[in-house]
């Protein structure tokens, strides 16, 4: 653990003092972590992994190994105890692949057929097509949140740098910021970056840049309510812990779930925590689409018209208040299917 932390810190070019400031803990603790005289807590391990860009699974395995050795390493019955515990751990904690409904499995199969077809035409991918679809995504995602820019106005702001008369500065910034956030997740996809706290906060920072600079890229410090929803997000003092669990859940399930289900689950879990004062919906949709892009799918564009918006909100509400995610998983799967069909139609296939 100590070598892993020190090497990662030095690779990032950070001093122990800088790491301590970024994590909000005492510098002496960082030195003790690196010397091996003190072990970080689970929460500190998650934060260190995010800050120093260490694979969460790798560092958690090292942390747990050292924790086990500290507790029972010198006991004469340690090895026997571990052998007995191994089977229990396998039984209790091995993530199981959740059985999907027949309806959901059918649409996932249809999506994968469409993706396979699209994969055969990847060499014909057009920058102009991608640019047009990303523009539509920015338009629709902002429209969901109440932005009144039309698709044409969104285009003029992004590609012509124009100011639209009668539209607020916030609406202009929402358009510009979202388009830059799309570029950012595409860069993360190209670099095969892991989804961690740092990247989620960076996406959110882009979304609120110039709109709420004091809240951009930071977890909320106040309680919030979701207008029109009976779901009550967690209290602000619980947000950091909920987000820690969020990232652990992702690491545990990222290799188990179908990518569409994983992306939809991450979307729902993040927006349910509602970790930010504003920009939760856009950030959640961007993180969802980052996962889809990483697995070779295309952006799932949720429409912002009234009917689509109500279907989206109702599916979310059911997931949040009744712990029934079927409607939401089906909704996201349908959005991805429609996006794939449209893309294939555009390229004439």
Q: Predicted segment positions?
A:
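Short basic helix-loop element that most often maps to the first helix and adjoining turn
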Residues: 3-22
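Recognition helix of helix-turn-helix/homeodomain-like DNA-binding domains
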Residues: 24-39
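Conserved hydrophobic/aromatic packing and binding residues within compact polymer-binding modules
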Residues: 5, 19-20, 30-33, 59
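DNA major-groove recognition helix of helix-turn-helix/homeodomain DNA-binding modules
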Residues: 43-58
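Helix-turn-helix DNA-binding elements, focusing on the entry/boundary residues of the two helices
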Residues: 5, 16, 27, 42-45
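Conserved short acidic donor-positioning loop in nucleotide-sugar-dependent glycosyltransferases
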Residues: 62
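FIC/Doc superfamily catalytic core
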Residues: 10, 66-75, 79, 86-349
